[in-house]
UniProtKB/Swiss-Prot annotation:
Taxonomic path: Bacteria, Bacillati, Bacillota, Bacilli, Bacillales
Protein name listed in UniProt: Small ribosomal subunit protein uS19
Recorded name of the encoding gene: rpsS
Organism of provenance: Exiguobacterium sibiricum (strain DSM 17290 / CCUG 55495 / CIP 109462 / JCM 13490 / 255-15)
Protein family per UniProt: Belongs to the universal ribosomal protein uS19 family.
Gene3D superfamilies tied to this protein: 30s Ribosomal Protein S19, Chain A
InterPro entries listed in its UniProt record: Ribosomal_uS19, Ribosomal_uS19_bac-type, Ribosomal_uS19_CS, Ribosomal_uS19_SF
GO molecular function: rRNA binding; structural constituent of ribosome
Length: 92
């Protein structure tokens, strides 16, 4: 279930402040954040945001298609290695 339209999209204030500061200065350095729950706003376009996945910060370059999605959608937290293969040696 999505967020109520009357509330509007959510983004952490500290992340918005970092992006606004970078936009004013005109620099494109990597912005490190732990806020996976923040919605991507149009002001984020063109910035690289390092989103924490529980182990490391994953760099996410924000494009126009990402607006409206959450930052956490682009930094997966689980790595799937695959199921065990057919080990015919052990079945003998």
């Amino acid at each position: 279930m999505g967020r109520s339209l009357k509330k509007g999209p959510f983004a952490d204030h500290h992340l918005l402040a970092k992006v606004d500061k970078a936009n004013e200065a005109g620099d494109k350095h990597v912005i490190k954040t732990w806020s996976r729950r923040s919605t991507i706003f149009p002001e984020f376009i063109g910035h690289t945001i390092a989103v924490y996945d529980g182990r490391k910060h994953v760099p996410v370059y924000v494009t126009e298609d990402m607006v409206g999605h959450k930052l956490g959608e682009f930094a997966p937290t689980r790595s799937y290695k695959g199921h065990a293969g057919n080990d015919k040696k052990t079945k003998r």
